[in-house]
């Protein structure tokens, strides 16, 4: 997809005074930051402040990290922390910082025929076991995204290997998976931000939330400029500094409040 807890943020990012020598920047990120509308909100303001224009490539976290390894992106905004730390340790990125977090939730048909909300409330492993035991339709991202990685980890923690006609692997982004789950009146795990941004168009409701295993941390990583001659390291660092700045963090905190009554992401830069 293409498109042109307490925080201690960096000092505020000022307005651009000169046009950067290389003003074009490639950001590889997750579909959740795109589908939620966050990037449409942030990036014009980043451009206004710095002079950099951003081409966004929204894919799963696994694909975004691979783009970095292949030198096909300048900076990453992703959400699979252990994989991100490994990416930096192996020399593919120069540094990694927490940016913001939200959480994953289990959504499903409002009728809730399995009574997951009442029975399991905040127990995601218990809810998934009930879905598996009853062979209720579940739609997986199936795309090596951060959300997909989290889902697989939770199945594993519940000692369940999901397989069968009831388990559908979509190989798609979060917005598409929510639409499929809605059409099939199925269950899925989603980040809260994308769900809230689409909630009015879906017949799905939140059934399980609040489990500590559903925490969803996002990080920013400039790609190592040695990964390719075209890597725009100055632009990558400018993006990192801006999104970690007091201004960037405050904008993240504001996003979604007016429309949804709550922020879709909580800033926690370090």
PLM region spans:
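Serine endopeptidase catalytic core focused on the charge-relay Asp
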Residues: 106
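C-terminal motif of bacterial Sec signal peptides marking the signal peptidase cleavage site
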Residues: 2-6
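Short, conserved active-site loops that position catalytic residues or coordinate cofactors/metal ions
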Residues: 71, 102-103
